């Protein structure tokens, strides 16, 4: 699992393709399979790049990065039950009533009458991980201060490794 932050081309308000090129190089040169792409959305991320977002106001805030899950095999171990989220109020109501509007959808998917009648203990999460990285006094910062070490300005939100450790082990 790798997260490569977004990159902007120097001196212009355009995205660099370097993160995508890096992904493809890892995949092709190492013989890896791209299992799934995730989006890490940080609602607390500061506006940037400053020149294009705040000063010239020709771009919007860059608030997400891609996380790529790669593997040496097309079928690596994973279990989405380990990262199930609480059911929504509507899903809980549906499970208790046992009634669902079954039939063919505009998408041409056919939903059976019992499709959503099984309580699986939680909802399958999406591939968008929303996590602010606003911790100002965690053990990392405490230890850095204690040992007079510089604090890295772009630390990963703890929710990211926690999700993948639970999902993939």
Question: How would you name each of these model-derived features?
Answer:
Residues 1-169:
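Core catalytic lobe of class I
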């Amino acid at each position: 699992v790798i997260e490569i932050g977004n990159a902007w081309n120097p001196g212009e308000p355009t995205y660099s393709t370097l993160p995508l090129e890096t992904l493809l190089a890892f995949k092709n040169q190492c013989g890896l399979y791209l299992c799934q792409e995730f989006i890490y959305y940080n609602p607390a991320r500061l506006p940037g790049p400053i020149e294009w977002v705040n000063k010239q106001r020709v771009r919007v805030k860059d608030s997400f990065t891609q996380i790529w899950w790669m593997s040496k095999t097309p079928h690596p171990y994973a279990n989405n039950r380990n990262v199930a989220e609480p059911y929504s109020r509507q899903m809980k109501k549906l499970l208790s009533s046992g009634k669902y509007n079954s039939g063919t959808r505009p998408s041409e998917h056919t939903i059976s009458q019992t499709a959503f009648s099984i309580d699986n203990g939680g909802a399958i999460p999406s591939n968008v991980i929303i996590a602010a990285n606003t911790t100002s006094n965690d053990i990392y910062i405490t230890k850095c201060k204690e040992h007079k070490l510089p604090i890295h300005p772009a630390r990963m939100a703890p929710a990211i490794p926690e999700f993948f450790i639970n999902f993939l082990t």
